[in-house]
A protein has these predicted regions:
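Glycine-rich loop(s) and the adjacent beta-strand/alpha-helix scaffold that form part
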Residues: 182-185, 189-238
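Dinucleotide-binding Rossmann-like beta1-alpha1 core, especially the glycine-rich loop
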Residues: 51-55, 63-99
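Fold-independent oxyanion-binding glycine-rich loops
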Residues: 9, 31-33, 159-161, 179-182, ...
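Conserved redox-cofactor binding core of oxidoreductases
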Residues: 84-186, 206-207
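Conserved N-terminal glycine-rich FAD pyrophosphate-binding loop of Rossmann-like flavoproteins
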Residues: 33-57
Length: 238
């Protein structure tokens, strides 16, 4: 039992665990993978100290946000988008300071250009690494954030697969997660203040793909394949 339970050890989950532990919460993160996982790159914020160091002007969000919202027929949560715009700079600067303290280079990706959006996205690399393309150094960042989360007192457990959410019958709030360990036994993680699901999309879930996007099931090759929770980002596609 802890204040916060985080499910998933990607960049989102690791950063959540680190931030909560930094603020004094008791945190347990568990993941189906056997290590922190990065399957992408292109870390975006509305502005940040690295962009400022390069002398790039602050993004005017109007055209960019309008284009992105229109692409989704304006069915998105616009309040959430604006929260991202208003708070992403603070969050990214926090992350940049941490990974730099762990000897990770922070740079702007060379292959990220949008017609009516920002010409920058944050990438990461090992010291001396001159590669600045999307995703190539993301593992450096997630491992640095994992180290910081542990330093702040977070507990991280791997090879543990979430199986069922437990909801409060009166409020409907998710209060716990039942998971299966590598030895086949089950464990219940109770979060008194919150449960954070940071497990990514359902591109590796055969049942959900079959229901919501059956036409791609043969293409992604999941018909008879076992899920590999440790698979990293594939440059040829997921």
């Amino acid at each position: 039992e802890d204040d916060i339970i985080v499910v998933g050890a990607g960049m989102a989950g690791i950063c959540t665990a680190a931030a909560a532990a930094e603020k004094g919460a008791s945190v347990t993160l568990f993941s189906a993978s056997s290590q922190p996982i990065s399957r992408g790159g292109s870390n975006f914020s509305a502005y940040n100290k690295v962009v400022e160091e390069y002398g790039i002007d602050r993004l005017d969000p109007v055209d960019f946000f309008y284009h992105e919202e229109r692409a989704a027929s304006f069915t998105i949560d616009q309040k959430m988008w604006m929260r991202g715009y208003n708070n992403s700079e603070e969050a990214m600067n926090w992350c940049i300071d941490i990974v730099r303290s762990k000897d990770v280079e922070v740079f702007l990706e060379s292959d990220n250009r949008l017609d009516n959006g920002p010409d920058y996205a944050i990438g990461f690399g090992a010291k001396g690494d001159d590669t600045a393309s999307a995703s190539t150094g993301q593992q450096n960042a997630v491992e640095a954030m994992e180290a910081y989360a542990l330093e702040q007192g977070a507990t991280i457990i791997y090879d543990t697969v979430a199986k069922q959410l437990v909801r409060d019958e009166e409020t409907g709030r998710v209060t716990a997660v039942v998971a299966q360990k590598a030895d086949g036994s089950y464990v219940k993680f109770v979060g008194h203040k919150g449960i954070v699901l940071a497990t990514g999309d359902f591109s590796a879930n055969k049942e959900m793909i079959a229901k919501y996007c059956p036409q791609i099931l043969p293409i992604v090759g999941l018909e008879d394949a076992e899920t590999d929770y440790n698979r990293g980002f594939a440059l040829t596609g997921l």
